[in-house]
Amino acid sequence: MAFVLMNNTNAFLVTLLLLSLSYIPLSFSTIQQDFVMCLVDNSDASFPMDSSFFTHDLNASSFKLALETSAQNLRYLMPSNPKPEFIFEPLYETHVQAAVLCAKKLKLHLRLRSGGHDYEGLSYVSEMETAFVIVDLSKLRQISVDIESNSAWVHAGASIGEVYYRIQEKSKIHGFPAGLCTSLGIGGHIIGGAYGSMMRKFGLGADNVLDARIVDADGKILNRAAMGEDVFWAIRGGGGGSFGVILAWKIKLVPVPEIVTVFTVTRTLEQDGTKLLYKWQQVADKLDEDLFIRVIIQPTSKTPKSKERTISTSYQGQFLGDANRLLQVMQRSFPQLGLTKKDCLETSWIKSVMYIAGFPSTAPSEALLDGKSLFKNYFKAKSDYVEEPIPVEGLEGLWEKLLEEDSPLTIWNPYGGMMAKIPETETPFPHRSGTLFKIQWLTLWQDGKTSEAKHMGWMREMYSYMEQYVSKSPRSAYVNYRDLDLGMNGKGSDAREWGNRYFKGNFERLVEIKAKFDPENFFRHEQSIPTELE
């Protein structure tokens, strides 16, 4: 059960509030009581404190639901994983300010959650400090679209799908270049970079941010002018949970055509899949900027009734234009795929987003408002950036590795276009010119702890095999595909071990900004930006 905090500045009414909860008098801890009283004392009285507050002690089922609803990686919901003291869901910005002030006063460690998609569960689990609380921003999801200024203010708890839907409500010829997974929380998504199917045309979501509102470690709300250009730079790609609580982003809308074309073409190894993928590597970053073709690679049965497996390569594309122009582009640049008019689906931009995200073709656009993840598994993920085509022999070795595992999945996303034009120091996200494509590595399973060691072991072996074919010095990684194998704060490793992989030459600047903006390191987690380097 969630209990409701009613706004009262009067100490007597605060006492009545706590007494009203005392039907389980020994279960409501001193920490929780102190936090409730502090919240009421530090919130603006004009905004009712009717936020939800979930604690395991008062009602385990409601607490479990609040903890698990948005969590994507089931590995971090096992009974053995640390659980928060409580979960607080603010309804107004002033409640977030109060939560920061009270956590600081009571020396409580905060975990900040907007969408719950952190691959290593860092928005809802803490291994480094087990006495922690979650501030869940999912109720802060207001979206205000202004077509005249080509901009929108979007609060951190809104999902990417909601943002897309609210934009298309106002205009069929405007969009935003962000994520492919529509259940992502926009707060954490943009702060890590935010790539999507229009990145080759318009860059990342973080490249299209005009302003932001953030709560700092002193509980102050700062916009771009107040936080300064250094902090504004840092929060557009520097990773979540390091500089403050993102309340909202002001994003720049981009033009999209009335007709967008999507397609999926699948080839197996028996259909020259290896040769085709080698060719894709040579052209994917050089294609027309209106065209995005990613490759989804996984084992599949050779025939519907066969137990023998092969490798499937699915080329999934989005083109900002009609099918006739797409076919001209493909014939000129990538005829080897053999794309035909029959493969193409002409649709609206919003429907193309849903196609890429995996929604059924019959799903209405209102399905984007649901915000629920279509992907929920036990999994381990890693990432790589590729700067030279992987040779055929390297691909053949990869196929052998993939066929060893039960449910592996790898997704290759093309770069080039606008991504190659933006300097790598423009934001903390450095993976720009020279990158051909990014690889996401995944292994998924359904039976919890019993087979985790097996799947984790396979992932690390495969990752080791691929080292010779990917970026070097550093072997780069994407911060929003969080990977604790790269190193952790407080575990005896130099933060450069993971920081340089995520941010390359931008890491030291991030550390300098962190030291000035949050010198006490209030906002921290296993891979947060440190205040100093060893």
Curated annotation (Swiss-Prot):
Protein name as it appears in the record: Monolignol oxidoreductase AtBBE-like 13
GO molecular function, one term: coniferyl-alcohol dehydrogenase activity
SUPFAM superfamilies in the cross-refs: FAD-binding/transporter-associated domain-like
Family: Belongs to the oxygen-dependent FAD-linked oxidoreductase family.
Chief localization: secreted
Keywords: Cell wall, Disulfide bond, FAD, Flavoprotein, Glycoprotein, NADP, Nucleotide-binding, Oxidoreductase, Secreted, Signal
Post-translational modification (record): The FAD cofactor is bound via a bicovalent 6-S-cysteinyl, 8alpha-N1-histidyl FAD linkage.
The organism's place on the tree of life at top rank: Eukaryota
Cell compartments where the protein resides: Secreted, Cell wall
Cofactor note: Binds 1 FAD per subunit in a bicovalent manner.
Pfam assignment, any one: BBE
GO cellular component: extracellular region; plant-type cell wall
6-(S-cysteinyl)-8alpha-(pros-histidyl)-FAD (His-Cys) crosslink site(s): H117-C181
Enzyme Commission identifier(s): 1.1.99.-
Reactions performed catalytically: (E)-4-coumaroyl alcohol + A = (E)-4-coumaraldehyde + AH2; (E)-coniferol + A = (E)-coniferaldehyde + AH2; (E)-sinapyl alcohol + A = (E)-sinapaldehyde + AH2
Cofactor(s) needed for function: FAD
Signal peptide: 1-29
Glycosylation sites per record: N7, N59
